[in-house]
Amino acid sequence: MGLSDGEWQLVLNIWGKVEADLVGHGQEVLIRLFKGHPETLEKFDKFKHLKSEDEMKRSEDLKKHGKTVLTALGGILKKKGHHDAELKPLAQSHATKHKIPIKYLEFISEAIIHVLQSKHPGDFGADTHAAMKKALELFRNDIAAKYRELGFQG
C-alpha cells in the first residue's frame, strides 16, 4: 500500500503549505477534531475545560499542541514510508501513556484532510487529496501494527 514517488511529491508539496503556518493549521486541525468528535477532548487534560470554539481559539496550549502534532507528522511524512524510527516512540507514548485509540487517529486524519481542503482548495485537488489520504492511512496502519507489538488493542 505504499505511495508512488509522484504521490509522495504531491503530499510533500501540500505539506510545504502546512509548514508555512504550523500553528494555524495545527490549531484548526485540533478544533475540527474536538468539535467533530468531542469524546477525543477527554484524552487531553489540558483541553478538557475548553467547551467553545472561541475558548479553543484563545488557548495557547492548544496552539502549541497543534504545532507539535503537525511537526511530528511532517517529520513522518518526509520519510516517505520509511518512518519506523519516528513511529516507534510515538506509538509507545500514544499506546502506553496516553492510550489513544486508532479510531482517534482516523478522526484526526479526517480533520487534517478537511483543513487542507478548506485552507488550500486550489492546491488540494483530487490527486493530492487521494495521495494525502493514502499517506495518512499508511501512517495509521503502521502505528496500529506498533500498538499490537506493544499489546495495546486501541
Curated annotation (Swiss-Prot):
GO molecular function: heme binding; metal ion binding; nitrite reductase activity; oxygen binding; oxygen carrier activity; peroxidase activity
Pfam family, one: Globin
Keyword field contains Hydrolase: no
Domain Globin: 2-148
Source organism, top-level taxon: Eukaryota
Reactions that this protein is recorded to catalyse: Fe(III)-heme b-[protein] + nitric oxide + H2O = Fe(II)-heme b-[protein] + nitrite + 2 H(+); H2O2 + AH2 = A + 2 H2O
Cysteine pairings via disulfide bonds: none
Gene Ontology cellular component annotations, sorted alphabetically: extracellular exosome; sarcoplasm
Subcellular compartments: Cytoplasm, Sarcoplasm
Listed GO biological process terms: removal of superoxide radicals
Subunit structure: Monomeric.
UniProt protein name: Myoglobin
